[in-house]
């Protein structure tokens, strides 16, 4: 079996491919055992591919856990200049987060046409690809949870209770002003993505990540695809060697 891992800033997702049907799970990077769901499968794993944007210390901790569990080399998959007809716009591809590249690869393999991929995690990334597979560029923005945490920490005197309600009306209390303001900002992002999709003539918008449903609820007209980073890794794994 092949173990695929998407290790983000705060959470990780994993998938076991080659089991007749994929087995999937998730964990928190800071936990002592973020891969506890794999406890019954380690001996069956013969290959490990990882896409990560985690800090070096978090990556090293994960690396040790993987080596202790599976006893096979860990292969790290980073952004590339090109793969399967998809080409990167970055002059220095090592500066692109691996998760963005692998999500784009999954989108490209899925449609082979122009598209946007929106990954709504701790940060929100937006990337555009034309019909020829050329990455046109993208954006990186703070996600809903990151913005909320920032206000709690850096503007502690505001004092507000978190709400998951997605309301963009003007607030009538401090809590409403903050929570509605975050939804209002995100709705503005949604509108900009729609404008860009029209301007670039994109055929599809793919939406993935933990806050995908929230962006969809705020009006983003997109196909929600769970685990696009893992899909991209699985495509790389199917090619054999890196």
From Swiss-Prot:
A monovalent cation. Ammonium or potassium. GO terms for biological process: coenzyme A biosynthetic process. The active site is at residue 99. It catalyses: (R)-pantothenate + ATP = (R)-4'-phosphopantothenate + ADP + H(+). One of its GO terms (molecular function) is metal ion binding. The keyword Iron-sulfur does not apply. Belongs to the type III pantothenate kinase family. This is Type III pantothenate kinase. The gene is coaX.
